[in-house]
Protein backbone atom coordinates (compact mmCIF):
# COMPACT_ATOMS: atom_id res chain seq x y z
CA UNK A 1 0.00 0.00 0.00
CA UNK A 2 1.06 3.54 -0.66
CA UNK A 3 1.46 5.92 2.28
CA UNK A 4 -0.64 9.10 2.40
CA UNK A 5 2.20 11.57 1.78
CA UNK A 6 3.28 9.70 -1.34
CA UNK A 7 -0.31 9.50 -2.59
CA UNK A 8 -0.79 13.22 -1.93
CA UNK A 9 2.42 13.96 -3.79
CA UNK A 10 1.19 11.98 -6.81
CA UNK A 11 -2.08 13.95 -6.80
CA UNK A 12 -0.23 17.26 -6.70
CA UNK A 13 2.06 16.24 -9.55
CA UNK A 14 -1.04 15.92 -11.70
CA UNK A 15 -1.51 19.68 -11.30
CA UNK A 16 -2.54 21.39 -14.51
CA UNK A 17 -1.68 24.91 -15.61
CA UNK A 18 -3.14 27.03 -18.37
CA UNK A 19 -0.82 27.10 -21.40
CA UNK A 20 -1.09 30.58 -22.90
CA UNK A 21 0.14 29.37 -26.30
CA UNK A 22 -2.24 26.42 -26.72
CA UNK A 23 -5.09 27.92 -24.69
CA UNK A 24 -5.50 24.58 -22.93
CA UNK A 25 -4.88 23.23 -19.46
CA UNK A 26 -1.79 21.03 -19.49
CA UNK A 27 0.09 18.97 -16.93
CA UNK A 28 3.15 20.78 -15.62
CA UNK A 29 6.31 19.00 -16.73
CA UNK A 30 9.44 20.71 -15.40
CA UNK A 31 12.59 20.72 -17.51
CA UNK A 32 14.42 19.37 -14.46
CA UNK A 33 12.20 17.76 -11.79
CA UNK A 34 15.13 17.86 -9.34
CA UNK A 35 15.30 21.67 -9.55
CA UNK A 36 12.29 23.64 -10.77
CA UNK A 37 13.15 27.21 -11.73
CA UNK A 38 10.62 30.01 -12.10
CA UNK A 39 11.22 33.52 -13.45
CA UNK A 40 8.58 36.23 -13.23
CA UNK A 41 8.69 39.90 -14.09
CA UNK A 42 8.70 42.03 -10.98
CA UNK A 43 7.80 45.65 -10.28
CA UNK A 44 9.17 48.87 -11.71
CA UNK A 45 10.11 50.69 -8.50
CA UNK A 46 9.35 54.39 -8.96
CA UNK A 47 6.31 54.66 -6.68
CA UNK A 48 4.16 52.63 -4.30
CA UNK A 49 2.96 49.20 -5.40
CA UNK A 50 -0.45 49.03 -7.05
CA UNK A 51 -3.02 46.25 -7.14
CA UNK A 52 -1.51 44.79 -10.34
CA UNK A 53 1.88 44.43 -8.61
CA UNK A 54 0.23 42.76 -5.63
CA UNK A 55 -1.84 40.43 -7.82
CA UNK A 56 1.23 39.13 -9.63
CA UNK A 57 3.15 38.68 -6.39
CA UNK A 58 0.28 36.74 -4.79
CA UNK A 59 -0.29 34.52 -7.85
CA UNK A 60 3.42 33.78 -8.26
CA UNK A 61 3.82 33.07 -4.54
CA UNK A 62 0.87 30.66 -4.62
CA UNK A 63 2.37 28.80 -7.59
CA UNK A 64 5.78 28.59 -5.91
CA UNK A 65 4.23 27.32 -2.66
CA UNK A 66 2.32 24.59 -4.51
CA UNK A 67 5.41 23.55 -6.46
CA UNK A 68 7.47 23.42 -3.26
CA UNK A 69 5.08 20.76 -1.94
CA UNK A 70 5.79 18.67 -5.04
CA UNK A 71 9.44 19.13 -5.90
CA UNK A 72 12.66 18.89 -3.90
CA UNK A 73 14.08 22.21 -4.98
CA UNK A 74 12.29 25.25 -6.39
CA UNK A 75 14.06 28.53 -7.13
CA UNK A 76 11.90 31.59 -7.70
CA UNK A 77 13.45 34.64 -9.37
CA UNK A 78 11.60 37.91 -9.89
CA UNK A 79 13.39 40.99 -11.14
CA UNK A 80 13.32 44.56 -9.93
CA UNK A 81 13.19 47.09 -12.77
CA UNK A 82 15.27 49.91 -11.32
CA UNK A 83 15.88 51.91 -14.50
CA UNK A 84 13.03 53.02 -16.72
CA UNK A 85 11.51 56.19 -18.17
CA UNK A 86 9.06 56.41 -15.24
CA UNK A 87 11.95 56.21 -12.77
CA UNK A 88 13.91 58.87 -14.65
CA UNK A 89 10.80 61.11 -14.65
CA UNK A 90 10.33 60.56 -10.90
CA UNK A 91 13.97 61.52 -10.34
CA UNK A 92 13.55 64.73 -12.34
CA UNK A 93 10.30 65.55 -10.54
CA UNK A 94 11.61 64.97 -7.00
CA UNK A 95 15.26 65.87 -7.48
CA UNK A 96 16.21 62.58 -5.82
CA UNK A 97 18.89 60.33 -7.25
CA UNK A 98 17.53 57.32 -9.16
CA UNK A 99 19.25 54.89 -6.78
CA UNK A 100 17.60 56.59 -3.78
CA UNK A 101 14.16 56.31 -5.37
CA UNK A 102 14.57 52.70 -6.44
CA UNK A 103 16.08 51.55 -3.14
CA UNK A 104 13.28 53.24 -1.20
CA UNK A 105 10.46 51.79 -3.32
CA UNK A 106 12.05 48.33 -3.51
CA UNK A 107 12.09 48.22 0.29
CA UNK A 108 8.51 49.51 0.50
CA UNK A 109 7.37 46.99 -2.13
CA UNK A 110 9.00 44.07 -0.31
CA UNK A 111 7.53 45.21 3.02
CA UNK A 112 4.07 45.58 1.47
CA UNK A 113 4.21 42.12 -0.12
CA UNK A 114 5.39 40.61 3.17
CA UNK A 115 2.47 42.32 4.92
CA UNK A 116 0.17 40.56 2.44
CA UNK A 117 1.72 37.24 3.50
CA UNK A 118 3.64 36.83 0.26
CA UNK A 119 6.99 35.04 0.45
CA UNK A 120 9.57 37.11 -1.39
CA UNK A 121 11.46 35.58 -4.32
CA UNK A 122 14.64 33.63 -3.63
CA UNK A 123 16.50 36.03 -5.93
CA UNK A 124 15.57 39.61 -6.91
CA UNK A 125 18.02 40.73 -9.59
CA UNK A 126 18.07 44.43 -10.36
CA UNK A 127 17.97 45.48 -14.00
CA UNK A 128 20.92 47.85 -13.44
CA UNK A 129 23.09 44.89 -12.42
CA UNK A 130 22.70 43.47 -15.93
CA UNK A 131 23.14 46.51 -18.19
CA UNK A 132 26.22 45.03 -19.95
CA UNK A 133 24.28 41.87 -20.83
CA UNK A 134 21.34 43.96 -22.10
CA UNK A 135 23.62 46.07 -24.28
CA UNK A 136 25.24 42.91 -25.68
CA UNK A 137 21.85 41.42 -26.51
CA UNK A 138 20.66 44.66 -28.12
CA UNK A 139 23.82 44.83 -30.26
CA UNK A 140 23.30 41.21 -31.33
CA UNK A 141 19.66 41.87 -32.27
CA UNK A 142 20.69 44.91 -34.35
CA UNK A 143 23.52 42.94 -36.04
CA UNK A 144 21.07 40.15 -36.91
CA UNK A 145 18.60 42.77 -38.23
CA UNK A 146 16.03 41.74 -35.64
CA UNK A 147 16.01 45.24 -34.14
CA UNK A 148 16.70 48.75 -35.37
CA UNK A 149 17.37 52.21 -33.97
CA UNK A 150 14.89 55.04 -34.47
CA UNK A 151 14.51 58.38 -32.70
CA UNK A 152 16.85 57.34 -29.88
CA UNK A 153 15.10 54.01 -29.27
CA UNK A 154 15.84 50.43 -30.24
CA UNK A 155 12.77 48.67 -31.59
CA UNK A 156 12.10 45.07 -32.59
CA UNK A 157 11.94 44.50 -36.33
CA UNK A 158 8.65 42.61 -36.14
CA UNK A 159 8.89 40.98 -39.61
CA UNK A 160 12.09 39.25 -38.43
CA UNK A 161 10.09 37.31 -35.82
CA UNK A 162 7.72 34.90 -37.55
CA UNK A 163 5.85 34.13 -34.33
CA UNK A 164 5.83 37.66 -32.88
CA UNK A 165 2.57 38.23 -31.02
CA UNK A 166 1.64 34.54 -30.87
CA UNK A 167 1.29 34.47 -27.06
CA UNK A 168 -0.82 37.62 -26.96
CA UNK A 169 -2.92 36.34 -29.89
CA UNK A 170 -2.22 39.61 -31.69
CA UNK A 171 -2.06 39.80 -35.46
CA UNK A 172 1.56 40.32 -36.51
CA UNK A 173 0.64 42.32 -39.63
CA UNK A 174 -1.46 44.74 -37.56
CA UNK A 175 1.46 45.20 -35.17
CA UNK A 176 3.78 45.91 -38.10
CA UNK A 177 1.31 48.51 -39.45
CA UNK A 178 1.28 50.25 -36.05
CA UNK A 179 5.06 50.33 -35.65
CA UNK A 180 7.15 53.48 -35.54
Range-by-range predicted roles:
Residues 14-89, 94-96, 124-127, 134:
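N-terminal catalytic cores of NTP/NDP-binding nucleotidyl/phosphoryl-transfer enzymes
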Residues 1-12:
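Single conserved hydrophobic/aromatic residue that forms the stacking wall/gate
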Residues 126, 133-180:
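Active-site cores that bind ATP or allylic diphosphates and position pyrophosphate for catalysis
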Residues 106-118:
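A glycine-rich helix N-cap at a beta->alpha junction
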Residues 116, 120-123, 127-128:
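Metal-cofactor-binding active-site regions of metalloenzymes
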Residues 98-100:
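A short acidic, glycine-rich active-site loop
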